[in-house]
């Protein structure tokens, strides 16, 4: 039996939701700046997108006058189950938007091939990312998203970015969110992108608020949010946000994200997925753990050259040993072989519809070009 207190809480939540959706409509109608919604496929960005959709759908069609772009960033090394889920969702969003006459289009951005993870790690020999040398975030996440936003700014003059971030997630995030607030408005200035503003409609939500909204409200594009909940339970994870500046925390704990991430000691989300039945992903976990082992101070010199990429040798202070440079060419060839073997194993055991390319053909071509020009690999080790 439902208590009076629970009934009152439900009524207050419904009332708050009505007020929030009215607020969203007011912000939408206040100017001609198009919206760009950052969508990672996780609970927070799904909640924000669903809220925006339901609020704007309540407007007359003639009032839905400015475009809303749903932007998803694929690093090309995302966990395969997440990539497939997002691809299916983006297709469903575009189909539903067309059916409902919504001004919404969904698209995915990816890194430039020359900036991709494997081109840098296997092609150029960059060591696996670490807290001290996290070369990946800007190349894989920030730059592709920012390029899209800059193009929209060039086209429209200014844009408003909708981010599904919550101040309760961390003190750092709360501080960043309040730092650039524009007094008297719902918007903040973007910290690095001129012409871009930020709107955070679920800023005050708790994690319970997010799940309550998702499980009590049907997805406008007819996805089942219980599937999203099941995915979280299987991975016991958070989500990697769309990262558009260096102040926004990227992944680095138990979150959905890049399966190659070595910034953390253990990939708890991937381990949990494997333990909960997704054992076809185990070759990825094994390869990720090998990359992490190359950061072991006692073993670094097994894998890395004593010279930098430009041929110089660098010492720190009075140290007698040099700072390790890129991965040795012979180890890069070994890594490529292991990556292609992992791809074969994963696809041989993947459930129907879950097959994936761990490395793109274009990346292999760029690796071949780099190896020929920098290593004199005319024997073509890539083939």
Feature annotation, model-predicted:
Residues 1-36, 43-383:
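Nucleotide-activated chemistry modules centered on ATP-dependent adenylation/adenylyltransferase
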């Amino acid at each position: 039996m439902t208590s009076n207190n629970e009934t009152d809480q439900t009524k207050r939540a419904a009332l708050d939701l009505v007020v929030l959706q009215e607020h969203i409509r007011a912000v939408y109608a206040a100017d001609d700046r198009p919206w760009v919604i950052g969508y990672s496929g996780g609970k927070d960005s799904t909640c924000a997108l669903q809220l925006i959709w339901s609020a704007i759908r309540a407007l007359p069609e003639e009032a839905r006058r400015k475009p809303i772009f749903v932007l998803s960033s694929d690093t090309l090394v995302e966990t395969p189950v997440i990539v497939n889920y997002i691809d299916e969702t983006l297709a469903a969003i575009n189909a539903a938007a067309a059916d409902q006459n919504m001004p919404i289009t969904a698209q995915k951005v990816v890194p430039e091939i020359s900036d991709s993870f494997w081109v840098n790690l296997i092609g150029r020999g960059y060591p696996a990312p670490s807290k001290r040398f996290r070369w990946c975030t800007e190349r894989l996440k920030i730059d592709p998203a920012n390029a899209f936003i800059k193009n929209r700014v060039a086209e429209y003059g200014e844009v408003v970015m909708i981010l599904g971030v919550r101040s309760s997630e961390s003190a750092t995030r709360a501080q960043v969110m309040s730092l650039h607030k524009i007094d008297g408005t719902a918007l903040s200035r973007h910290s690095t992108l001129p012409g871009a503003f930020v709107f955070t409609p679920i800023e005050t939500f708790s994690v319970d608020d997010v799940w309550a909204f998702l499980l009590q409200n049907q997805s406008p594009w007819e996805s089942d949010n219980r599937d999203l909940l099941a995915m979280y339970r299987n991975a016991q994870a958070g989500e990697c946000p769309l990262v558009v500046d260096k102040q926004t925390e990227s992944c680095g704990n138990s979150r959905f994200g890049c399966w190659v991430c070595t910034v953390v000691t253990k990939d708890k989300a991937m381990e949990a997925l494997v333990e909960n039945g997704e054992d076809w992903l185990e070759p990825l976990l094994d390869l990720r753990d090998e990359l992490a082992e190359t950061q072991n101070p006692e073993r670094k010199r097994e894998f890395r050259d004593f010279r930098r990429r430009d041929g110089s040798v660098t010492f720190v202070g009075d140290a007698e040993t040099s700072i390790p440079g890129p991965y040795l060419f012979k180890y890069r060839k070994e890594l490529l072989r292991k990556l292609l073997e992992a791809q074969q194993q994963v696809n041989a055991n993947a459930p129907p519809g879950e097959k994936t390319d761990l490395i793109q053909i274009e990346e292999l071509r760029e690796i071949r070009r780099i190896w020929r020009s920098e290593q004199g690999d005319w024997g073509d080790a890539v083939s």
